[in-house]
């Protein structure tokens, strides 16, 4: 399929709750979902991302893909897709996030990273690419990714979770970069890599 432009903060599709993908009585998914999943994987891979939600490429459907280390410091990676995810988490800390351990980035906020409070454990239930039920869970970075991508599908950005000086720094970065308006995007493989991979 294709690498697709990634929408940047300010695009309304990022602030709109996505629509669940319909499932047939026989458990089948619409044929075009396979193409969407391929586009998501190709775009995420070209961007060197650990996850990508459909609305980040302008498609308001409830699906995300991931290719993420199992947890910080471990060598293994987990790769997959979750359709119509439902998220569960452990408690989210109410303290100021640690700038060394809690830094988070987003392909829709290219090149920026800010400390973000997240639960250390998360689980999503949903469907795989064949429409079969799946459960995916993890801790650390993997849990952070599950929360981040499901948040996208609910119409939120990680910037919404920032507090204190980190929230102020993010607002300055959005303004400095000229974001926060509709119609902005970047295309992995064509535009410079904002994260310097």
From Swiss-Prot:
Q: Which ranges of the sequence are coiled-coil?
A: none
EC number(s) recorded for this UniProt protein: 3.5.1.88
Pfam families to which the protein is assigned, alphabetical: Pep_deformylase
From the UniProt record, which GO molecular function terms apply? metal ion binding; peptide deformylase activity
Report the cofactors.
Answer: Fe(2+)
Binding-site positions, Fe cation? 106, 148, 152
Q: Per the record, what are the reactions this protein catalyses?
A: N-terminal N-formyl-L-methionyl-[peptide] + H2O = N-terminal L-methionyl-[peptide] + formate
UniProt entry keywords in alphabetical sequence = Hydrolase, Iron, Metal-binding, Protein biosynthesis
Active-site annotation: 149
- Quote the record's cofactor note: Binds 1 Fe(2+) ion.
GO BP, one example? translation
InterPro entries this protein is in? Peptide_deformylase, Peptide_deformylase_sf
**Stated family:** Belongs to the polypeptide deformylase family.
Free-text function comment from the UniProt entry: Removes the formyl group from the N-terminal Met of newly synthesized proteins. Requires at least a dipeptide for an efficient rate of reaction. N-terminal L-methionine is a prerequisite for activity but the enzyme has broad specificity at other positions.
Q: What is this protein called?
A: Peptide deformylase
Which organism was this protein described from?
Answer: Mycobacterium sp. (strain KMS)
